Each structure stands twice: as structure tokens, then as C-alpha cells.
Amino acid sequence: MTTAINEAAKRAGSEPFYNNLQQFGRIWRALVIAQFADSFGPYPLNSGSGENPTFNSEKETYRFILDELKDAVNKIDTSITPTEDQAKCDPAYGYVADKWQKLGNSLRMRYAMRLTNTDMASEAKAEFEDACKGGNYIKSQSDMLWFKSDNGWNDYTSPYTRTWNLQALSSTMANLMTNLGGVSVAEQRADLAEYTKPNTYLGYKYDQHFVANTDNPTKQYWLDGIPENLDPRALKMFWLVNDTQAENMIDPSSKGTKINPEGSELLLDADGKNTIKISGSFTWNGVPSGASTSWSPTLSKNKLITTASGIRSCYPLWGKEYCTGGEEGLGRVVFYGAWESYFLLAEAAVRGWNTAGVSDEQAYGDGVRASFEYFGVGEYADAYLESTDYNRVGTSVKFTHTTEPSSFEATYIDGYTKQEKKVTYQYPVASKTLYGVALNDKLTKIITQKYLAQMPYLVQEAWSDHRRLGLPFFDLTGNESVMTGADMTELKPNSWESGQSWKYFPQRMRYPMSLLTSDEAEYNHALELLGGNNTTMIPLWWSLGSNQK
């Protein structure tokens, strides 16, 4: 891709439109290079030049990205209007110069913020402030960078349209959205009221079938219903099993699953015999982290999460528009959303940076509203932003509400005896989280909301925020064995007891082995710049892990 961009830049010529075209290409190239560098690490900046690629450090790469974006934006002539035929060649913006300029500034804000843990932090601050000072960045849906998608086999194929993928709600996402914002499910969908459960109820506990070795505060519970209060975006993102009235209903058969409303025999006894039927109909549960990472004595008896049919028939799945793609709405693949600019400004303001008069609270609220508008739930935004209710990991929405959560008495049902019992619900211990500061401070709120808004297309950005800040709260993999032969050898069965570490979360993607076979010298050079072996656990230069190792 960078080869084509470089070639286009060479051929641009001096005609004003083609000068703009060159700058648009440079902005797109910067985005592509950043995606590579944020996935793998060191990148060859002379890639696509016709020379043998030579890897550069991550610092050099980011310096190049920021310089390119600034220079390209400054060289765009916004007075140039493309012809109709020219506009057809740009599926994103139709070569509208002002939109590309906003994208360039927005990306500059994004990548400057990436460097807060590095020796370029002061430069990052200056870059960010310069990019946002004129207010010329992406603020509305009309300026967003997104593309149509479909479920075929072409350049517009959506990443979520493959029927064999297990695209189910995760335990992390379920905990974040439960009770967040205090908006009742009954208000959102009156027909779902009968399935709701009070916030103080945790569900059925199956401690013989779900792993205990994790810091997930809802571990081993199966909620036999929907939370009383749920973030309004949840039911737009995910389809509840057997919810035939949902606008985002998917055809279960398209996922290779026949759903049994009465439940499937999925929890086994020690002899491997079917013992308990579980129904996923109208329930809100997330697949536990690490459910398929290593052999587990406990999970070997749980077909609910160790089989594809169990997951697809019992857990909420990404809704119809994600599965089919589309030219409008949620089916479009987002590369930069309006909400991201606002959450970047909010974080910058919290850090004390100059955000051109935009306060942290204002930017935070605008980010939430932009996300709600995108998901079509804008009518709930005002009440949501005033909520002081905590989600399952101890974070509330209201920006000025920074009181840390306290444990509370909850009820549950023993899954084996069917007896109702009480338990003290414990939120994660703030000092033991990867962030390590608080569960409900302003930065946690900002990144929690940013994470939810970025779903599902901007997962790389969400991953980058987690690697950089340790936010939002990701529960540790429920691990019952030493993962011999895997990259995550530091994560032992009892690691969760002492708290989180960056060593327990993947930090990067591996370079493909084709690089080794095609250019062994540069492969070794890249690893030298990376500072470690070609594994997923080597922290990138800008990450929290690199700062702590």
C-alpha cells in the first residue's frame, strides 16, 4: 500500500488539485504506517521507495508520522474543488480538501497523545496543542473517516462478516456496560422488562464450571436475565439470543447454530455426562477472558464456552449490521470517529495541556454525545451523563463524581443446590489494576467512554490506549496451568492474586516469518530496534510496559 502511495506522490505534478492529492496520500500513508508500527513495532520508512527496506526505530517512525501530518495539512489548498469524476475516486471524502485537513489534524492529535509515556512527551504536548488550536479537526459525523462495507470477498469486506468467527460479548465489555449510566432497559425496550434483574443480583454461581483464577469481579456467575440498567449502546451493538423483536437481529443459522430456547446440556459432571441445561435466551453474560487459551480442568466440563456452538447459542453476538455490512449506519467501517477528537481533548485537558478553551468536562460530554448520536440513542445522553451509578468494575459516568466505589451486599443462586445466598460484592482493587491509580477518576471515565465508543471497528486504538494507560479495566485471563510454549509464560495460575502487570497482557503482534526468510539481516535489525524477541509480549516504545520494564 505504501508503494502505491509513494508512486502517486511522485506523479502528482504541480497542478493545484494534484498537489492536494499528494497531501491526501501523505495523510493516509501516515495512518497506515502508524497502524503497522502500533501492531508490530519498528517500521522501514523507506518501504515502497524502490530500495531494500531498512527498519527504523519506533521513535523515528513517530517523528516521521507527526512531521508528515503537519506538513501535509499545511500544504492543502482548501480553495480547490475536485471535478465530479475526480471525487468519485475517493470513497471516503470525495477529495474534499477541508475534510482531509480535519483528518490530518485529528490524526496528529491521536498520535501525539500516544507518546505521553516517552521521552518525546514534551514534543507530543506541543504537537497536540498546535493541531487543535484552530478547532479544525473532526467534530461531527459528516467529517468522520469511514467506508462502506459488505459481506463479500473484496476490499470492502467488513471484518465481522465471517460466519465462523466467534463474535460474542466479552466479560470485559459486559462488566463495563452493566449499570453504566443508570438508564433502565425497560425505558429502552419495554418488551424486555420481564427479563431484567436488579443490580444487586449476580445470577447463578457455577464454581465447578467457571475458572476462579482471575480478577474478574463477576467470575463464575451466570446472569439468567438482563441487567436492570444497561448502557444504551449495548442493545445497539449486541443481539440478545432469541430476541426476535430486535432491530439488529441476526439469523442464528448464519452462525452455524440452532438455538434451543429451553437450554442446552452444556455443563458436565466429572464423568463427562450432561448435568445442567443452560439457556442463553435474553441474557447478558460475557465470554470469560482466556476461555480458549490453555487446557483447563474446570473448563473441560463447560461446553458453554469451550465449544463454538455453546458460545453462539448462549452469548450476545454482534448485531446484524456488523455481520452484513452496509453503506450507512453501523455497517460502515470507522477509521476515525467524531467522539475520538473529544476524548483526546478531554485527556489533554486533564493533563493540563492547552486545548484552546475546551474544558475536560465539556470535551468528555461532547464525546459521549457524539457516540450516542452515532448509535442512535441520543435521547438518553443527558440523563446518562448525570448518572453516579457504578458499573461492575467501579466506574460511573458523571464527570465530577469521582468517589471510589464501596462493596455492597448482593444475592445469587447456587447453581447446583438452587438455594439463594448472599455475598459481599467486591470491586477490583484499584492498586492491583494495571492503571493502579483509581477506579473512578476522570481519566478512567474518559478512557472507559472512549473504549466503548470505539467498538467494534477501532479495536486497535482501544488496544493502544490499554497498552499506554492500563485503561479501561481488562480482567486477567482465567488461567489454571503454566502456558508452556506460549508467549504469556509470566502469567501463572496464581498471578491474579498479587495484581495486574503489563506482562500478563499481549503487547504487540509478531512479525510474519516471511520477513525472516526474505531478509534475515533486516529481520534481526528490526528485533534489535524492538529490544526483544519476536513474541507478543515485548512492549512497544510508547507503552506503559516499556516505561515500567
Where in this protein do the model-derived segments appear?
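Structured, solvent-exposed acidic/aromatic patches
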Residues: M1-L344, A348-Y374, N440-D441
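C-terminal functional modules
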Residues: S300, I305-E321, G325, R332-Y342, ...
